[in-house]
């Protein structure tokens, strides 16, 4: 694998980890909280953002305005059944969600969840590293590159991996601070 390809793959893993972090509640209303919620719509699981306009009214309220009023009940049901711990209020045209402040216990649970997402991201980075190192070893074995080149490349791959793992650690600590901030 080329260095650029490795970095592209690792950037994708970082982005996926960041998307996971964005779905964790922090006590403030945020439209990305609903990114993981999907709605049963005409027999297919559809992301909520494909069915409605989602906006934040204030720091504690999310507003969901469906493009098709007929799916209002389905959206409400999906939000209620999600693991977000929030209750939707349906007024017949718009669903409003009041995001309650988090309890200390709930904040700690969300910190654990953030740590889990960070670990998944690091595992993905290590898998990319493993694949790249395996390719280097194969090229060395096949005689395409020298032993020294292979070791230099493996060392460079490790440096890139370390850099990206440190980036995930930084993002995790930022997210934990955001979650624990009262």
Curated annotation (Swiss-Prot):
Cell location = Cytoplasm
A single GO molecular function term of this UniProt record: ribosomal large subunit binding
> Is Signal tagged as a keyword?
no
Q: SUPFAM superfamilies annotated for this entry?
A: Ribosome recycling factor, RRF
Q: Which GO terms describe its cellular component?
A: cytoplasm
Key word Protein biosynthesis present: yes
Q: Which GO terms describe its biological process?
A: translational termination
Q: Which UniProt keywords apply?
A: Cytoplasm, Protein biosynthesis
Q: Which domain of life is it from?
A: Bacteria
Function according to Swiss-Prot or TrEMBL:
Responsible for the release of ribosomes from messenger RNA at the termination of protein biosynthesis. May increase the efficiency of translation by recycling ribosomes from one round of translation to another.
Q: NCBIfam families recorded for this chain?
A: frr
Similarity comment? Belongs to the RRF family.
Protein name in UniProt? Ribosome-recycling factor
Quick one: which gene encodes this? frr
